[in-house]
Amino acid sequence: MPTPKKGARLGGSASHQKKILSNLAASLFEHGAIKTTDAKAKALRPYAEKLITKAKSGSVADRRNVLALVPNKEIVAYLFNELAPKFENRPGGYTRIIKLENRKGDNAPMSQISLVLEETVSAEASRATRASASKKAAEEAETEEVVEAPAEETATEEAAEEK
């Protein structure tokens, strides 16, 4: 049996916290981004990412597990059929938390948690761009050296002529 989480819970009780996270995850999958408090966003991130990882596998058992946690068939179907294929090449980090201004009424710290749907740049592509950039920089440095070398010689020649 897992040990209970220490500290304050969202909503007061364990069952209320589970429902809050379930509803926040459903809203996140439905809208793509939601605005909530920092504490809820930080608690939602691992919860939602585990659901997306289960959706990526696509097995019937995982679908039933997700349906037990998010009791909305339409959202679970959307998660498995449309969102999971978008995250197929991404090994993790499906969500992003952006800090916002504090809430006006009670000055609570607010955040926007959103799904990261942009394509990731592979390590090979970034390595290739870095290599090409370093080659260009090396070529530019060589051309600058070639241009600077005659200029220095002419300066020393002019100094010799003046003497």
UniProtKB/Swiss-Prot annotation:
**Keyword terms, alphabetized:** Ribonucleoprotein, Ribosomal protein
Q: Name one GO biological process term.
A: translation
Task: Output the PROSITE patterns linked to this UniProt entry.
Answer: RIBOSOMAL_L17
Q: Where is this region: Disordered?
A: 123-163
Low complexity bias: start-end ranges: 123-135
GO CC terms: cytosolic large ribosomal subunit
Provide an example Pfam family for this protein. Answer: Ribosomal_L17
Q: Which InterPro entries match?
A: Ribosomal_bL17, Ribosomal_bL17_CS, Ribosomal_bL17_sf
Compositional bias per record (Acidic residues), positions renumbered to this chain: 140-163
Q: Which GO terms describe its molecular function?
A: structural constituent of ribosome
PANTHER family registered for this protein in UniProt: LARGE RIBOSOMAL SUBUNIT PROTEIN BL17M, RIBOSOMAL PROTEIN L17
Q: How does it assemble?
A: Part of the 50S ribosomal subunit. Contacts protein L32.
Q: Which family does it belong to?
A: Belongs to the bacterial ribosomal protein bL17 family.
Task: List the protein's name.
Answer: Large ribosomal subunit protein bL17
